[in-house]
Amino acid sequence: MPATNINIGEPWMWAAFIVFVLAMLALDLFVFGGRKAHRVSVREALSWVIAWCLLALSFAALLWWYLHGAFGADIARQKTLEFLTGYLIEQSLSIDNMFVFVMIFSYFAVPPELQRRVLLYGVLGAIVMRAVMIFAGVWLVSQFEWLLYAFGVFLIITGIKMLVFAEHQPDLDKNPLLRWVRGHMRITSSFHGERFFVLQNGVRWATPMFLVLVLIEASDLMFAVDSIPAIFAVTTDPFIVFTSNIFAIMGLRALYFLLADMADRFHLLKYGLAIVLVFIGGKMVLMPWLHMPVEWSLAVVGGVILSSVLLSLVMTKDAERRTE
């Protein structure tokens, strides 16, 4: 049986990974300052970004070691590459989500020391939503294989739209979800620390922090609609899809605090992400006629993202020199 058709997730592997995720969230919440409102420094954010990257690479190494002994070298190599490619795709596409976080926090003028907690709850919600979407997607693809081609067309269209509207900034005042919540709930005019709800004269009011949480969860749902089909171009193994997604999500919060103040320096990244979506969508549509090894997908995605980041930095530096 080809390695790509084997689902490797055994019950103990699922249980161990879920315990690991819950343990890391508990450490973040109760040990490493998650309970205390504070402004996340660049040093702290960088430490967490490095930690999550090392954890993802360590997981890949453990996965290869276990599969090499249980299934052989070919399957170990294939599944490890699938995980790394999926992780890179999810991490890259999640950066676009980070830009939306910047816009939401700026719109509501959320103090930096309050952003950590709302992003933690955002991560928790994202894990649940993505788990549901991943298992639903894997089941649908297993029942209706033609959906892979539909996903491919969808990603191509999404990538083209991203190219065309890369410079477009959505107007949150016109956001239908935000308008609906404001029209159906009592919202306080100011923040009350990290609280989402407060009692005023015996009446429960939502705070602006609740609106921020709603928009962050909604934005992750929208980005998951793009990113989850994208990884199906690499693998439909639910364990690989789930673990690569979760590692990317867990690292996103630290990445936000590291890069939020420099978001304008990566102005070409959206174009790179759009090219990645078109490439992945094309790969899915052409699967019956063109087989691309997972190593090539990893190289293309990594090359496009790295090139767009480096070119953004070069152009930004040149622009700064001209204005001096």
Task: Describe each PLM feature range.
Residues M1-E324:
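Multi-pass alpha-helical transmembrane bundle typical of ion/small-solute transporters
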